[in-house]
């Protein structure tokens, strides 16, 4: 039986999000509005929390967006809960909980690739550094080198009570 190790607790997750929020504001100081697009499920919960933090720190406008993916499809299947025309010439921040091979983040980016976008940035809570796809996280909460058979689990309670990041 594999040992489960908690690598981030609720307080640490919040601290990471707050630090990344300041980095986002610094990177986007000239923007009036930013679309924060969370990849369902964990990325969307993180995006929701991030928007709450950003709204406390800045007068800029932050729009929360949900990205739904079908990673089992042989063709890219991803969609947002807003019309794609809303994103034209705008700044988008794509949020994911764990960056492992890069497939999920690549699919999330794919939604916006045929649009005239001003700027796209990516944020991940945990980066495992096991890329199979050519993507990077612009804002990262924690980088951790793991072996392939290890697994990172991000537990995010919708109310933020029992959060944690675990290594198995």
Describe these PLM feature segments.
Residues 13, 36, 120:
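Residue-level signature of catalytic and energy-coupling elements of molecular machines
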Residues 33, 61-63, 91, 119-122:
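Residues at the starts of beta-strands that form the adenosine-phosphate
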Residues 17, 48, 52-91, 103-107, ...:
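Short, glycine/charge-rich flexible loops or terminal/linker lids adjacent to PRPP-binding catalytic cores
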Residues 22, 26, 48, 52, ...:
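Short, well-ordered alpha-helices that flank and scaffold nucleotide-derived cofactor binding pockets
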Residues 110-168:
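PRPP-dependent phosphoribosyltransferase catalytic core
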Residues 30-40:
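Short glycine-rich phosphate-binding loop at a beta-alpha junction
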Residues 90-119:
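Internal catalytic or translocation cores that form aromatic/hydrophobic pockets or channels
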Residues 1-32:
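Active-site-facing substrate-recognition patch
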């Amino acid at each position: 039986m594999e040992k489960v190790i908690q690598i981030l607790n609720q307080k640490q997750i919040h601290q990471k999000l707050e630090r990344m929020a300041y980095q986002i504001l610094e990177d986007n100081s000239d923007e009036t509005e930013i679309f924060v697009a969370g990849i369902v499920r964990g990325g969307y919960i993180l995006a929701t929390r991030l928007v709450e933090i950003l709204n406390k720190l800045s007068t800029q406008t932050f729009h929360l967006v949900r990205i739904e993916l079908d990673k089992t499809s042989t063709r890219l299947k991803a969609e947002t809960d807003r019309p794609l025309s809303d994103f034209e010439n705008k700044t988008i921040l794509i949020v994911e909980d764990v960056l492992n091979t890069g497939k999920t983040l690549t699919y999330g980016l794919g939604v916006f690739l045929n649009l005239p976008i001003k700027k796209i940035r990516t944020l991940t809570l945990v980066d495992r550094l096991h890329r199979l796809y050519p993507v990077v996280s612009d804002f990262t909460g924690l980088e951790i080198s793991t072996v392939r058979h290890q697994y990172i689990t991000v537990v995010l309670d919708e109310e933020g009570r029992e959060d944690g990041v675990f290594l198995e």
